[in-house]
Amino acid sequence: MTAAVFFGCAFIAFGPALALYVFTIATEPLRIIFLIAGAFFWLVSLLISSLVWFMARVIIDNKDGPTQKYLLIFGTFVSVYIQEMFRFAYYRLLKKASEGLKSINPGETAPSMRLLAYVSGLGFGIMSGVFSFVNTLSDSLGPGTVGIHGDSPQFFLYSAFMTLVIILLHVFWGIVFFDGCEKKKWGILLIVLLTHLLVSAQTFISSYYGINLASAFIILVLMGTWAFLAAGGSCRSLKLCLLCQDKDFLLYNQRSR
């Protein structure tokens, strides 16, 4: 039973991200490098936010329950803010690298910023999902474990779906964020930051897992639609994708008529 819970939750949380990696990134060495770099940037942001939280905890030096809760909220907000700052820093690094590649070799085709946004977002998401869920996932292997004592028996399942949402949201946030940077629409960056804060702070607002998960999925659908449009998607391109028909195939059919 515990093995089934472990593998089931693991595939729910990381299955889509693994599929995205295998089918869209694994065949391109350069994309793998950008993915690892994005994951590294997220790790550095986590390290800095952890140091800030630890310093705040040492300065306050109060172990009361309410104080610890406020420290946790403070740490969450600081972590989200630093993550988005590092997302912007990674964008600037990729932009400079792309411009440098064009100046050195004008004939070389640099990867598009939309592609880099997707790859970096997936790197952010995978690393975020691993750090947020791996401890919970390891607890599911405990002898006779169905849930955590005093909590919902569906805790592991909710956590798996929430990890899935966070990973995909990081992909969508990355695409929308880079698009806002490219167009110099700084309000878009603020929206990404606010939605990130909202999803991260849901557990402080409500203790009902079902409500938190439903609202997170709503944000996921909205951000996914926005990212699809920002990446140049349309109803026509979506239809062609679903029907497995590319542009050359359509032009050939039109010419034959």
UniProtKB/Swiss-Prot annotation:
The keyword Transmembrane applies. It is a multi-pass membrane protein. GO terms for biological process: amyloid-beta formation; Notch receptor processing; Notch signaling pathway; protein processing. Signal peptide: none annotated. InterPro entries: Aph-1. The chain crosses the membrane at residues 5-25, 32-52, 70-90, 115-135, 158-178, 186-206, 213-233. It is found in: Membrane. One of its GO terms (molecular function) is protein-macromolecule adaptor activity. Its main location: membrane. Keywords: Membrane, Notch signaling pathway, Transmembrane, Transmembrane helix. GO terms for cellular component: gamma-secretase complex; transport vesicle. Probable component of the gamma-secretase complex, a complex composed of a presenilin homodimer (PSEN1 or PSEN2), nicastrin (NCSTN), APH1 (APH1A or APH1B) and PEN2. Such minimal complex is sufficient for secretase activity, although other components may exist. Interacts with PSEN1 and PSEN2. Belongs to the APH-1 family. Probable subunit of the gamma-secretase complex, an endoprotease complex that catalyzes the intramembrane cleavage of integral proteins such as Notch receptors and APP (amyloid-beta precursor protein). It probably represents a stabilizing cofactor for the presenilin homodimer that promotes the formation of a stable complex. Probably present in a minority of gamma-secretase complexes compared to APH1A. This is Gamma-secretase subunit APH-1B. It comes from Pongo abelii. The gene is APH1B.
